[in-house]
């Protein structure tokens, strides 16, 4: 079931070009209609939110017009994080939620992401139904002119409700911690003051003045350099950085070192296990997590399960097998006991709570994980679908793995989106890892490279 409009994260594109207001209207209209067919209510209720990028209001208004045209009751949340929408859909018992964001991508992009009433991404089946309507030659959906049209109301209490929910996910306040908070000039900007003040944190906000054009710009979880500097200059205990829509969190320890998603999962997983809260003693990760994290988990008798790259696959695995902690190196971390998607502010509170409760510094807690040097090589290939069947490629991979003898790993896989073969290796030293990647790369070039 290949979808034309919906990618792994909803409908994405360059705002006002690929993702035009006209398309947003149609996505609202088609999505709204599909919901009316599956809802028990006479008038389905949908929550709509956006991040801080300048195109958000244009797309929000177009999308809402589409929803109203097929009779949906819309509650407009304004600027709220993606996980905020996922939580509020469930708390409000709405039929769906829609988030307008392109997450960590550059400002010219935007996207439309639907959540079902359960707070998870819409099912593939429902997305397929919406696609069928978007692709139809003519729009035959109902067009009421009076009774049967939808209504819209601002729902500012939503943000307060979400903040109170976050606060009750940790058992005590966080007094005594000094923390720098980087809001990426994104959707968390309006939340951090209330949240961290309520938790009695001595906090220093940075990059919390969105102007519509500065979301993620040299700041936030994808550019933590300004956070590293601020933590050291302010002699803070640690720093946390979110991304544009608030579904990621990366930390910086008291010495100014980056503590990525792998290390955060390890620290929180070990703590949850000690408290008897980690289901099946297991952390769910993607294949891109660092070998150092797996070794640290093993040293504490904790298990891990690997999925394909993408937080949706992590969530699928967690739901299927009853795990409650998982995530990605990039900082999408899912605490399934609390929320249905990666949640940056929730992750930050859990991490701060562990730091306070342990009495250790973040640097000490992260020290258990020795990050192995990692190198990634992309090679353009003629046919990525058959690349992995090449005998010589299989042989060199097996040879390298034998030489590593458990102190390193190789991951060779076709790109999900481009005609590339991705060769990733981790080993004890940068020199070794470079040698391994190049040896596999040489064979791939000779056997598979585009002429």
Swiss-Prot record:
InterPro entries: A-D-PHexomutase_a/b/a-I, A-D-PHexomutase_a/b/a-I/II/III, A-D-PHexomutase_a/b/a-II, A-D-PHexomutase_a/b/a-III, A-D-PHexomutase_C, A-D-PHexomutase_C_sf, A-D-PHexomutase_CS, Alpha-D-phosphohexomutase_SF. It catalyses: alpha-D-glucosamine 1-phosphate = D-glucosamine 6-phosphate. Its cofactor is Mg(2+). The modification Phosphoserine is found at residue 103. Belongs to the phosphohexose mutase family. Gene3D superfamilies: Alpha-D-Glucose-1,6-Bisphosphate, subunit A, domain 3, Alpha-D-phosphohexomutase, C-terminal domain. It is an enzyme of class 5 (isomerase). Binds 1 Mg(2+) ion per subunit. This is Phosphoglucosamine mutase. The keyword Repeat does not apply.
């Amino acid at each position: 079931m290949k979808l034309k409009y919906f990618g792994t994260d909803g409908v994405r594109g360059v705002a006002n070009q690929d993702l035009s207001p006209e398309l947003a209207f149609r996505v609202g209209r088609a999505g709204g209609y599909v919901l009316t067919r599956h809802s028990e209510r006479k008038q389905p209720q949908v929550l709509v939110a956006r991040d801080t990028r300048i195109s958000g209001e244009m797309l929000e208004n177009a999308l809402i017009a589409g929803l109203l045209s097929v009779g949906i009751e819309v509650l407009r949340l304004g600027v709220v994080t993606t996980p905020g929408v996922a939580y509020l859909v469930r708390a409000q018992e709405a039929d769906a939620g829609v988030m307008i964001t392109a997450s960590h991508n550059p400002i010219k992009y935007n996207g439309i992401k639907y959540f079902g009433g359960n707070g998870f991404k819409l099912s593939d089946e429902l997305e397929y139904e919406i696609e069928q309507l978007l692709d139809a030659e003519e729009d035959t959906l109902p067009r009421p002119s009076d009774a049967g049209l939808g209504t819209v109301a601002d729902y500012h209490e939503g943000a307060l409700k979400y903040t109170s929910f976050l606060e009750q996910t940790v058992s005590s306040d966080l007094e005594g911690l000094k923390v720098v908070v980087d809001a990426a000039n994104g959707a968390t900007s309006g939340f951090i003051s209330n949240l961290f003040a309520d938790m009695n944190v001595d906090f220093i906000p940075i990059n919390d003045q969105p102007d519509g054009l500065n979301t993620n710009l040299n700041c936030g979880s994808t550019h933590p350099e300004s956070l590293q500097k601020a933590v050291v200059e302010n002699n803070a205990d640690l720093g946390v950085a979110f991304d544009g829509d608030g579904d990621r969190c990366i930390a910086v320890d008291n010495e100014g070192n980056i503590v990525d998603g792998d290390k955060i999962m390890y620290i929180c997983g070990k703590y949850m296990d000690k408290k008897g809260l980690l289901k099946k003693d297991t952390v769910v990760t993607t294949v891109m997590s660092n070998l150092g994290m797996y070794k640290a988990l093993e040293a504490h008798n904790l298990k891990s399960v690997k999925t394909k790259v993408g937080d949706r696959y992590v969530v699928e695995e967690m739901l299927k097998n009853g795990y409650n902690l998982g995530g990605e190196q990039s900082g999408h971390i899912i605490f399934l006991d609390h929320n249905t998607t990666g949640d940056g502010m929730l992750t930050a509170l859990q991490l701060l709570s562990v730091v306070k409760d342990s009495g250790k510094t973040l640097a000490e807690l992260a020290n258990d994980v020795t990050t192995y040097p990692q190198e990634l090589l992309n090679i353009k290939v003629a046919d990525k679908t058959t690349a992995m069947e090449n005998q010589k490629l299989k042989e060199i991979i097996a040879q390298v793995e034998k030489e590593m003898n458990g102190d390193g790993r190789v991951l060779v896989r076709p790109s999900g989106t481009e005609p590339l073969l991705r060769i990733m290796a981790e080993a004890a030293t940068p020199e070794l890892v470079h040698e391994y990647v190049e040896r596999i790369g040489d064979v791939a070039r000779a056997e598979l490279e585009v002429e």
